[in-house]
């Protein structure tokens, strides 16, 4: 068809949005059309050419009757009949999504049809909250984007166009009080109020900060708020720190003066009110309410004052409390303020795993007999189970939102972009009555704790790779995150059109390669959890943890039970994944396990590596291979594919190493060495890629394990390999013979068959009545009686299990009435043996994107 020369965008007067978000979205569409030399008219009546009719819920519209349009907040639809396009939205945000979808098609399209794509398109949100957090951590690097108004316009437009509905500007997250006191140097916005406000009557200020810069900071905050509102985005301001030891930070670059024990709470209260009044577009505030935010746990009086400051602004403002250390008394204090209340636990520790919520926390996260200290009485005491997951927040009758925060501990530098996993996060974000997800964006924590470097915000050292704005490298990442959180069934064309524009003939190779690559680090993180803290464990630029002993103790020793070695690191799902040590113990005992083994993980990683390698092989023969975007994508795919090979070999080596540690048998040394050698070879290959592309010192913190690059990690791995090879001649092991039990363990290890799953199995019931027995039945053949594993959806509790009974060609078990009588929903899975293989129902699908358990909601 011939490209049209004129488009009319018809906005009926009854929409009542002449200056608001719909008008902004219409202008976005008009601008995209004008960039393609199309004349555009926006008005109440069409003036010829293609007509884009904008219609809201309850309005008469053509060409379709709209009968199938979902009556749900944020729903949108596009219909087309010839030269007439209907852009429908249930509400303002739905209309914004409809119009920006058309604008995106115009911008990314390359054919004659300006609006080429899926028609009709009807979409509605799965995750109610879809938030993106941007952290200010480094004055040297972050002022660059904070003061850049055009950057904000472009960035917020990108978020709104990709169906995010909330933006969270996050201040004060760079340090954890009091643990990081010795490291405190860059405190810009750490205690944020005096960097934004002059509060009469308190005498609190920042010595080195001019009044002009302080006022400029506040003006920029107000600008960001207005630009969010203009695009229909909620504006969340995260205030993570309420105090630190202002008089005991000799390395700090700014001095906060005038804070006393007596004036801290009223000052924070009044500053919160002043911020909310000066920036009326702020729709919510996030607070870290455990000791790391500066307020000792149990000091509820401070929070009564702070939340009163929120209420004093005179409008509804959501009080969002970070989950760690959160107790129900704190929730009640927030509730009594009269404001909307939310809790934001971590999705999977301070990292990123596969999309499902971990079945169980690490043993280290269950509450101890006594708290570490009085000021940590909750986060390191009675509420420790909330440290890194949803804890006991998902009660049947909760009256607060639960919004998961996906921290940037796993991956910060390399590209991510798997539509399958992104859709999985969209589905799991609503787990058991939850409300959504907030992502910490790529490059979060860049330059924190005083490690910011001018000119290194973009990580690249090779010329031509850095993008115009820091976030643009991750444009595709935001696209798949946002659109598939909104609608996990979004059409493939919604991300492929961007790849086709940027990558040409390599669009499909880039899609497939990046999809495989994006699963690598989430899986490694889940199966290998030496530390839940992003301050100590960075899987992306991995600090080596030795197979026997040696490297890694300083990074990981505080957060895992010793001995500190690779095979002894726990998993982040103790109910469904076994560590190498646990697996070796089972092999030596001649037992099987229902859990996934390190060899299962290694097999998955090899599949991911093969997928990356196939995409790379395809790409290298294309004339589009040297385009900038494919080069950025494929370099990261090559690094991640190499990491998949490395960790696959490391998991295998760890199984042999754990058998060796338990038996000292010399015959185990060579298999262990073979896998360890292959692991190092894989890292050498990926380090060769990073050495040419990325800076030698990527700074995400001051400690050695939070900075460096892939090639800087290599010498430690090579040194460990030399140490392992020295075991050959070590007198204590060179002639130790094996035992019959070891022979069986070796045979089982060599002949290991993968754990099977039945992810397509359907749950017999989706709801239950509390206080009544809950029968569970499965139709399956098994060698022995299957085992039912069940638990309240409460991470403070351990899993229960019972054997199932054969009945009418299947198996049944009943969860007793006294167990179902609780405030919580239930989850369960079944384990069994079939043809000599462990089997889980439902277990994980081959793409790892589903929930490996059934969820049963209480009526």
Q: Locations of the language-model features?
A:
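Aromatic-lined, polymer-binding surfaces characteristic
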Residues: 240-265, 278-283, 290-300, 631-648, ...
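Conserved, mostly hydrophobic/aromatic
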Residues: 91, 159, 287, 499, ...
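Glycan-association/targeting regions that enable binding to alpha-glucans and other polysaccharides
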Residues: 724-859
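Feature activates predominantly on carbohydrate-active enzymes
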Residues: 2-8, 12-18, 23-28, 32, ...
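Alpha-helical linker/edge segments of TPR/alpha-solenoid repeat scaffolds
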Residues: 700-734
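C-terminal non-catalytic alpha-helical accessory regions
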Residues: 441, 445-714
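Short, well-ordered secondary-structure micro-motifs within conserved domains or adaptor modules
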Residues: 40-69
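Catalytic-core regions of glycoside hydrolase
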Residues: 34, 109-110, 165, 177-180, ...
């Amino acid at each position: 068809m011939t490209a049209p020369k004129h488009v009319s965008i018809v906005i009926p007067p009854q929409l009542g949005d002449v200056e608001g978000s719909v008008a902004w979205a219409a202008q976005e569409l008009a601008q995209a059309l004008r960039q393609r030399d199309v004349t555009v008219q926006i008005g109440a009546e069409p003036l010829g050419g293609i007509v884009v009719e904008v219609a809201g819920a309850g309005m008469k519209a053509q060409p379709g009757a709209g009968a199938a349009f979902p009556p749900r907040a944020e729903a949108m639809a596009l219909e087309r009949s010839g030269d007439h396009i209907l852009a429908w939205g249930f509400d303002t945000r739905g209309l914004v999504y409809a119009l920006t979808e058309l604008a995106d098609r115009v911008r990314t399209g390359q054919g004659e049809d300006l609006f080429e794509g899926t028609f009709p398109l009807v979409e509605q949100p799965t995750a109610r909250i879809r938030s993106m957090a941007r952290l200010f951590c480094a004055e040297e690097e972050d002022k660059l984007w904070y003061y850049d108004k055009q950057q904000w316009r472009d960035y917020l437009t990108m978020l709104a166009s990709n169906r995010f509905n909330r933006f969270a500007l996050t201040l004060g997250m760079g340090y954890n009080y009091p643990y990081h006191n010795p490291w405190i140097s860059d405190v810009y916005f750490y205690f944020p109020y005096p960097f934004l406000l002059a509060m009469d009557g308190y005498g609190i200020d920042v010595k080195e900060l001019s009044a002009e810069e302080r006022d400029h900071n506040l003006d920029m905050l107000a600008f960001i708020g207005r630009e969010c509102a203009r695009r229909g985005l909620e504006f969340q301001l995260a205030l993570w720190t309420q105090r630190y030891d202002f008089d005991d930070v000799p390395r700090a670059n700014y001095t906060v003066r005038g804070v006393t024990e007596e004036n801290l709470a009223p000052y924070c209260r009044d500053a919160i009110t002043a911020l909310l009044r000066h920036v009326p577009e702020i729709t919510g505030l996030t607070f870290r309410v455990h000791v790391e935010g500066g307020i000792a746990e149990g000091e509820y009086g401070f929070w009564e004052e702070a939340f009163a400051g929120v209420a004093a602004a005179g409008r509804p403002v959501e009080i969002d409390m970070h989950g760690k250390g959160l107790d129900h008394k704190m929730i009640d204090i927030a509730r009594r303020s009269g404001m909307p209340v939310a809790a934001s636990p971590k999705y999977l520790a301070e990292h990123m795993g596969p999309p499902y919520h971990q079945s169980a926390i690490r043993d280290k996260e269950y509450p101890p007999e006594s708290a570490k200290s009085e000021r940590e009485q909750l986060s390191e005491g009675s509420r420790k189970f909330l440290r890194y997951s949803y804890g006991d927040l998902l009660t049947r009758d909760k009256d607060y939102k639960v919004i998961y925060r996906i921290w940037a501990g796993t991956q910060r530098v390399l590209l991510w972009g798997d539509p399958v996993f992104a859709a999985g996060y969209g589905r799991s974000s609503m787990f058991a009555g939850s409300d959504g997800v907030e992502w910490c964006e790529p490059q979060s924590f860049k330059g924190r704790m005083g490690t910011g470097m001018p000119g290194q915000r973009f990580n690249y050292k090779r010329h031509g790779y850095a993008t115009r704005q820091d976030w643009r490298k991750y444009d595709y990442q935001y696209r798949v995150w946002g659109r598939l959180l909104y609608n996990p069934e979004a059409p493939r064309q919604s991300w492929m059109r961007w790849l086709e524009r940027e990558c040409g003939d390599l669009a499909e190779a880039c899609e497939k390669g990046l999809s495989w690559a994006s699963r690598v680090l989430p899986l490694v993180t889940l199966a290998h959890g030496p530390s839940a803290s992003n301050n100590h464990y960075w899987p992306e630029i991995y600090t080596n943890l030795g197979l026997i002993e040696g490297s890694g103790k300083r990074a990981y020793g505080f957060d895992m039970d010793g001995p500190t070695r690779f095979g002894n690191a726990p998993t982040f799902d103790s109910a469904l994944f076994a560590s190498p040590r646990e697996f070796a113990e089972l092999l030596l005992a001649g037992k099987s396990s229902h859990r996934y083994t390190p060899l299962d993980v290694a097999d998955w990683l090899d599949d991911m590596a093969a997928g990356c390698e196939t995409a790379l092989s395809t790409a290298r023969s294309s004339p589009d291979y040297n385009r900038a975007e494919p080069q950025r994508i494929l370099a990261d795919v090559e690094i991640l594919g190499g990491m998949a090979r490395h960790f696959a070999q490391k998991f295998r080596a760890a199984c042999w190493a754990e058998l060796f540690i338990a038996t000292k048998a010399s015959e185990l040394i060579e298999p262990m060495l073979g896998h360890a050698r292959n692991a190092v070879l894989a890292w050498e290959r990926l380090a060769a890629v990073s050495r040419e592309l990325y800076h030698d010192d990527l700074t995400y913190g001051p400690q050695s394990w939070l900075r460096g690059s892939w090639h800087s990690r290599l010498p430690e791995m090579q040194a460990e390999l030399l140490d392992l090879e020295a075991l050959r001649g070590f007198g204590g092991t060179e002639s130790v013979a094996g035992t019959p039990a070891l022979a069986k363990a070796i045979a089982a290890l060599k002949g290991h068959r993968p754990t099977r799953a039945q992810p397509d199995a359907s749950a017999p019931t989706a709801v239950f009545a509390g206080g009544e027995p809950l029968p569970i039945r499965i139709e399956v053949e098994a060698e022995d009686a299957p085992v039912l594993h069940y638990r309240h959806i409460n991470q403070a509790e351990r899993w229960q299990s019972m054997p199932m009974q054969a009945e009418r060609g299947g198996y049944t078990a009943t969860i007793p009435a006294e167990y179902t009588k609780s405030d919580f929903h239930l989850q369960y899975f079944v384990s069994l043996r079939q043809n000599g293989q462990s089997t889980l129902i439902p277990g994980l699908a081959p793409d790892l994107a589903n929930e490996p358990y059934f969820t049963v909601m209480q009526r």
